[in-house]
Amino acid sequence: MASKNTNIVSKTLVESYIRKQVKALKQSPAETIDTLTKQLLDKPKGSLEKYLLHITPEKLQDTQSGYYKLFHDILPKVNTDHLVTLGMNIGYNGIFTASKNSQTNSPESKSDALWAFMLSIDGINYEKKSAQYKAQISNAKKNGTRCFMLFIEKNAWKLLPLIKKEKDCAFFLFCPSSCLTEKFLDAVKLTKNLFISVAYNSNGNKEQILSTNIFNRLRSRKLPYGIHYYYSVSDLDNFKSGEIFKKLSKEKPLFSFFLSKKADSGKDTVTEEEKKAVYEIIIKERYWLKYPSIPFEIEKDYYYLLH
């Protein structure tokens, strides 16, 4: 009982600290990052810590830096409760718990202590498969996972009851704009542990028409959101020139996610060498951040954050 009470107190203190830092980031980004950087320098460097050290106070004071624009113009307009809840669930409930599990559990279970879990959802036949999805999420949680990346093409609203129930988890929902109805977005506004990523294009051959109005609707509700883009080898020149980062950043997403396109057969249309080339460009852009949206290559970053 004492241990449980200690955990509750510890979690409350961490949440209070995160809330304080989020508010400070909104009000004084450079000073807050300077303080956090000094704290990180005194700690062991995991993948996340090493990345955070790239966001230096100098970059936040440089008006030409994407980090300056992101922290001064975009982040302050996002609801604080969303940022705190997502930060708590990813950081304290997720990464900390997974790390603790990997240290205390048997060697066989260490490989299962994932900080994030990816799952493709069949929105059309969701009712028939919901028990399967819930079991997968439950099993991942037993191993310490508290961050879930859900990919769905239809009927994203069906996932809301599950997401709301798992209050200690963070959910990144990757879906097309067609899922984002006014009613759904109103419900998302009340779902603090949910982060929406809007598909900029489709994974298949058929190109979708994306209305920029959807981003206005997300911003009007002060929701945190990202954009995901399915890339092919024909996009390589746009990666090299930076045009693709510039294009996506115009919609003011916190994050830009990139996924390689798949053929109808499910086979990847991008070779491993081409992915590596794209990833190297993304790492460079993320370090310097010319445009105000932090880019990630889903497959590569997911792998390197786990290893």
Feature-to-residue mapping (PLM):
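N-terminal [4Fe-4S]-dependent radical SAM core
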Residues: 45-120, 142
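Short amphipathic alpha-helical segments and helix-helix/interface helices
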Residues: 134-138, 160-164, 184-188, 211-216, ...
